[in-house]
């Protein structure tokens, strides 16, 4: 089973506060706790404006990697951000979450092909939305 530690996410108020204050100890403690709890990946999501996101993720990834060897799950809705932030990781990790909207998969899949070991959580939503039933989900999975 793959377990993704999702507790370093700027959508969580205490994490957003730590990010705003650049509280490295808070981020590191969250990474240690998730490592000790058996996570397979440590998710890293800044949830800040896109103009600040790459540099914020760099800082967060550096904090995490200073206390654990677990791979990073780089988490952003922006493929532009993902295509930069993965470079800060010491080892292959996970792109979390890439949807079928627009050209998002077209942007990330070539990066994965050029960087063996990277994985992806691919969402079945596309420009028409989230599939409403199992048949539609099965139809869309062929795109991935």
Where are these regions (language model features)?
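Catalytic beta/alpha-barrel core
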Residues: 43-49, 70-78, 93-103
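Gly-rich Lys/Arg/Thr-decorated short loops/hinges at beta-loop-alpha junctions or inter-strand turns
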Residues: 9-16, 36-45, 121-128
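Short, well-ordered coil/turn segments that N-cap beta-strands
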Residues: 1, 38-40, 68-71, 90-93, ...
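Glycine-rich, proline-tolerant flexible connector loops at the mouths of alpha/beta enzymes
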Residues: 35-70
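Short, charged, surface-exposed secondary-structure boundary motifs
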Residues: 102-110, 130-131
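Acidic (Asp/Glu)-rich catalytic clusters
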Residues: 35-36, 84-89, 107-117
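Conserved small/polar residues in nucleotide/adenosyl-binding loops
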Residues: 143-144
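Active-site mouth loops of central-metabolism enzymes
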Residues: 3-29, 94-100, 127-138
